[in-house]
Amino acid sequence: MFLTDKVILIVSPEQWGKNYVSKHHYALELSKRNNKVYFLNPKQAKVKNSCEKITDRLFVINYNSIFRGLNRFPFSLRKIIQCYHASMLIKIINHNIDIVWCFEPYRFQYLSVFSSALTIYHPVDIHKSNVERDIARNARFIFGSSDKILSRFSDVDKKIFKVNHGLNEYFLNPKKLSKSFIVNPNKINVGLVGNLHYPFLDCDTLSDIIQNNSELDFYFIGP
């Protein structure tokens, strides 16, 4: 299967917006390969089901969920509710879905409800949840951005692949890359690139590192 001319559903724990993290970049890049990509926002209360066009090949889906605390129930019951939600989303998309690419374990542990040829569970963070075992067992492939993340699935009988975070072509092109933001080019400059909105970012340790290395300049880059 080539990743072109497919209908792809991306299940994201972060909403579509101005700040992009890995899920948003995957959606954008996959849409550039002539795929029709549907980016599923986290479920929200009191929101009408909708499909917003971002580009000709990229759409954002908002949907309402009347079910709360679903992951406290047995898997057999969750499966029934997930079938209902999947049917609702397929109606919104109005296409058969070729690939379900899920970045979080909380909404659809039983990915087969979408009747897709390919299902991927792709954690880029460590999720401390019992339901993660269910989605790992039911996905066809498991991707992960680090060995530490993937080691948690060593006992799951699935094909597992390490997929590092990507780098935009912009940063590899010296003609496009701007370094004008560097104040002191003759000093040692330290860069941190990542999701600065991450709720578990160890700000105290970062502050200690900066204060104990005053001879260096630090640049934090990211949403």
Name each model-derived stretch:
Residues 99-102, 111-127:
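Active-site proximal beta-strand in glycosyltransferases
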Residues 84-92, 108-109, 113, 125-145, ...:
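Membrane-proximal helix-turn-helix segments that form the acceptor-binding/catalytic region
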Residues 182-201, 207-210, 218-221:
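Conserved donor-binding/catalytic core segment of Leloir-type glycosyltransferases
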Residues 130-133, 167-186:
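Acidic anion/phosphate-binding donor-loop and adjacent secondary structure
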Residues 1-48, 210-213, 217-218:
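N-terminal subdomain of nucleotide-sugar transferases
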